[in-house]
């Protein structure tokens, strides 16, 4: 298990981010998805394969989070191996290449987000099968190396259901055993995490957290 660095969130997840499974973290813009993933990688102590499809990864933000926690920012930056695929085809190649790159020195794989390029291109051709193959590679890596994989997902408005839903909901839902939704609240900096699915924890549990210089913090100030 990898700690999120937030006691209440770890408790919600049954101890933290589990190895050997895909954990989906989804939500609308600026809900803390990237910050959460970066924080988990920062605190993991090992290398992190970070696939950034949206340009949301900030070395400056990582350094700030490390420094705020009394960690060496240079050492933290060196542990993050960044990949920046420009389109869905390059994303496929990047995820495929992880089979040769990621080894036992890595503690986490993050794809942020798994559906950004998929959304852009899905109108032109059916990419659902290809997305499923990419998820299967990530699941294979998680099981082979015994590490967690976090796939960040976007949302879209479903007019039939009249609510926001994760992109490619069924494709990701089929392979992601743990699903966490992040939402904004009216109070600035305050967010809520809702457990939508888990292998052994009850669904529907929620915790509140803050976004600060340190990254993600418990509203009550409790840390692991």
Swiss-Prot record:
A GO BP annotation: DNA recombination
Listed HAMAP family: RadB
Source lineage: Archaea, Methanobacteriati, Methanobacteriota, Thermococci, Thermococcales
Gene3D superfamilies in alphabetical order: P-loop containing nucleotide triphosphate hydrolases (3.40.50.300)
Protein encoded by which gene: radB
Record's keyword terms, sorted: ATP-binding, DNA damage, DNA recombination, DNA-binding, Nucleotide-binding
Organism: Thermococcus onnurineus (strain NA1)
Family stated for the protein in its record: Belongs to the eukaryotic RecA-like protein family. RadB subfamily.
Biological role stated in the UniProt entry: Involved in DNA repair and in homologous recombination. May regulate the cleavage reactions of the branch-structured DNA. Has a very weak ATPase activity that is not stimulated by DNA. Binds DNA but does not promote DNA strands exchange.
GO MF annotation: an example: ATP binding
Protein name: DNA repair and recombination protein RadB
């Amino acid at each position: 298990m990898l700690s999120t660095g937030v006691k209440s969130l770890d408790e919600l997840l049954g101890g933290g981010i589990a190895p050997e499974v895909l954990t989906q973290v989804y939500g609308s813009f600026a809900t803390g998805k990237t910050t959460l993933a970066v924080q988990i990688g920062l605190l993991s102590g090992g290398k992190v394969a970070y696939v950034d499809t949206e340009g949301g990864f900030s070395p400056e933000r990582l350094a700030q989070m490390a420094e705020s926690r009394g960690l060496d920012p240079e050492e933290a930056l060196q542990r993050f191996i960044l990949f920046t695929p420009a389109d869905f085809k390059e994303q496929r190649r990047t995820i495929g290449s992880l089979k040769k790159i990621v080894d036992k020195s890595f503690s986490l794989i993050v794809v942020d987000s798994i559906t950004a390029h998929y959304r852009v291109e899905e109108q032109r051709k059916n990419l659902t099968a290809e997305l499923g193959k990419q998820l299967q590679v990530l699941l294979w890596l998680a099981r082979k190396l015994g590490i967690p994989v976090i796939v960040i997902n976007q949302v879209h408005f479903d007019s039939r259901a009249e609510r926001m839903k994760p992109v490619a909901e069924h494709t990701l839902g089929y392979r992601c055993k743990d699903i966490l939704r992040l939402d904004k609240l009216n109070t600035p900096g305050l967010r809520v995490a809702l457990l939508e699915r888990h292998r052994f924890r009850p669904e529907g549990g929620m915790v509140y957290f803050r976004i600060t210089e340190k990254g993600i913090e418990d509203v009550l100030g409790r840390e692991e």
